Amino acid sequence: MIFWRLHLGFLITALFVGLGAWLLLFKAAAQPHIKDDDSFFNHGSIGNEATQGIPYWIWRVLPEVFSDYLPQGPDSTAHDWTAFGVYWDKGSELPVGFSKKSLGKIPRVSPNCAICHQGSYRLSENSEPQLVNSGAGTQIDIQAFTRFLIRAAEDEDRFNADVILAAVEKHTELPAWEKAIYRYALIPGTKSALLKQAEAFKWMDSKPDWGIGRIDPFNPVKFGILEIEPDNTIGNSDMMPLWQLHLAEPEDGNRLSVHWDGLLTDVRETVIAGAIGDGMTYKSFALTEENLDRIDSYIKQISPPPSPFRHDIDEASPFFVSASDLGAGEQLYVQNCSSCHEPKGQRFRRVIPIEEIGTDKHRLDMWTFEAMNKYKNYQAEYDWGFEHFEKTNGYVAVDLTGLWLRGPYLHNGSVPNLRTLLMRPVDRPTIFYRGSDIVDTENGGFLSGASDDAKSRIWRVDTSIAGNSNSGHIWGTDLSPDEKEALLAYLKTK
């Protein structure tokens, strides 16, 4: 009888200890309401705190403790998360693309949709960067961010409670209970989780680097949550802007395509699948669905800032384009481009067969029938209701909303500017540099020379590397020089 009483007492004690630990460390708390839609997109939770969230104070000091692992090492101009290209408003607690939400009593910082879908621009070298909400991630280096976290976790000398808590103490004095949780649970737990990430992302080392402004969007999903064996495919492609996606809504019963290759034909499913890819599970979906619906509504309506290229400004301005060039360029656009790139065009947001468009095929081959079927049936214990995953044979004719902010061009960012997009592929640059956010007033897009921008981190693009081919999309390449200048003038205003 005494044994059973002791055993029962032990079970009750264990139950209360477990419940206390859950309430303290794991019970999801509601994120404070974010009223402004832009701020919500930039900082709202997508339900991935339990899988991707880093305890706030660890997240806060990692770039300081491991500054030598930042993309530019100790010479980086900023020993914080802006080293990876994210925009950080002065006075904001978090950079764009990060969400803060508590599990139990501990705030966690997690990436959200905006970590890839944000942009910035400068109209001159000395002007301040301007945030572009939901924009093409032209400054972001997701692979460098991933590798930084892995290298930090692998550093046995510094990723430990003594070093990290010493760094935290430079910013705040944690209560004794919280310091103990960080020392004995959160720091070793975060290290262990990141080391698992290191193992999960080993496949990256055998493939070409993504580079600034690009990502391999679905191989991490294939080899991770879908548990498909790593293959030789390369998915490197530019991070698309999420603007005016109401234009991708079904029209006259016909579904329109989303993603570069049209692997989905439903915007809401795209939002949910994206959150899953970033770590949301069915366990957190119920508390996150309202947020995802808000994101769905937001990206269907948001527009980019208007182009600075205009005809009604001082002719001495580098952004001046003549009314005559605009008129001639618009006619050429209607004749050569509008059937694919305008909402009323017959091929708008339709998949153009790879044999016709002729651009690099690697991104297309990365998405397989096996991946499609596994994503449709992801997590057998929960019915996500996915109905619109596809496997296509080409790339989507997307709208040109905010074209001036999308450079470099083509799905893999292999053409530096609009002027060279109108050249025959054989004449396009084989080497250029991306990462600048200074608008190229001469050529459209962003500056792409090795030394054009001293303030930005620049990445060398070599179009001979697998996945980087600048072939294809020959529309407009047979125009006369004068016609190309007129079309270029018009495209700059898009």
Spans of model-derived segments:
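Short, Lys/Arg-rich N-terminal segment immediately upstream of the first membrane anchor
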Residues: 1-5
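Periplasmic c-type cytochrome electron-transfer domains
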Residues: 6-10, 16-494
